Swiss-Prot record:
It is a peripheral membrane protein. One of its GO terms (biological process) is viral process. The gene is VP24. May act as a minor matrix protein that plays a role in assembly of viral nucleocapsid and virion budding. Unlike Ebola VP24, mVP24 has no measurable impact of host dendritic cell function. This is Membrane-associated protein VP24. The keyword ATP-binding does not apply. It is found in: Virion membrane; Host cell membrane; Host endomembrane system. One of its GO terms (cellular component) is virion membrane. It comes from Lake Victoria marburgvirus (strain Popp-67) (MARV).
Amino acid sequence: MAELSTRYNLPANVTEKSINLDLNSTARWIKEPSVGGWTVKWGNFVFHIPNTGMALLHHLKSNFVVPEWQQTRNLFSHLFKNPKSTIIEPFLALRILLGVALKDQELQQSLIPGFRSIVHMLSEWLLLEVTSAIHISPNLLGIYLTSDMFKILMAGVKNFFNKMFTLHVVNDHGKPSSIEIKLTGQQIIITRVNMGFLVEVRRIDIEPCCGETVLSESVVFGLVAEAVLREHSQMEKGQPLDLTQYMNSKIAI
C-alpha cells in the first residue's frame, strides 16, 4: 500500500532551540526512582513509569490462578507456563521498545550511511545491553547527528509509538494486536493488552543438524503501561471509540 511520506522535506532552518539540543542524550540512559515506579530520561523524552502489572505477571506465572485467568495463561503459555521465561521490570521493557523504534527506522528508511551507523549502534545498545551510557565518538556525533537529524530521530520514535496505538487489544475478531520484528539472534513481539503493551524477547537458535532457525524456549518479557507512551503519542484525538481496540474482558492483563 502506498503511504504518505516526508522523506524529501527540506530541513527547517536551525533555530536557537535546536542548537541547544543535547545530542549526547541519545547515548545516555538515565533511570531514577520515583513514587510508585521510575523516571527514565533518554533523548528528548522523559518517561514516567509506574510499577504497574508486575505483581499480576508474577501471579499469572504461578500455579495459583483463578479459573477466569486460565485463558490468559493458555494464550501466552510460552510466558506464563514456561520455567525458562523471565519477567523484567517495566523500564527494561521500555528500553526494548525504544531499541525496536530505532531499529525500525534503520531498516525501513534510506538513511545516509554515517547516520545509519549511529542509529544502529544506539539500537543495539538499547536492545542488547543494560548499561547507562554508550560511547560514541564526538566527531561522529558532530558530523552525522546534527540538530536536524536528532529531531528526525525523535520524531521517528514518536511515529513508532503512534503505530503501536493503532493496534487492537488481543481479540477474537482477527484484528492485528501485535508488532513483530526479527533481528540477528532474536525475535521481539510487542502486543497490546488491556493494561498497555506486553513486550517479549525470544532468542532464535540454529539447529546444528540442519541449520534451520528455531525459537528458543528462553524468553524475557515485561509490561509497559499505556500511559507511559500515551503522553508521547498523537493518536486517538477525536477518533471514535472502538472497544475491540481498547478493552477485552477475556484477558487478565
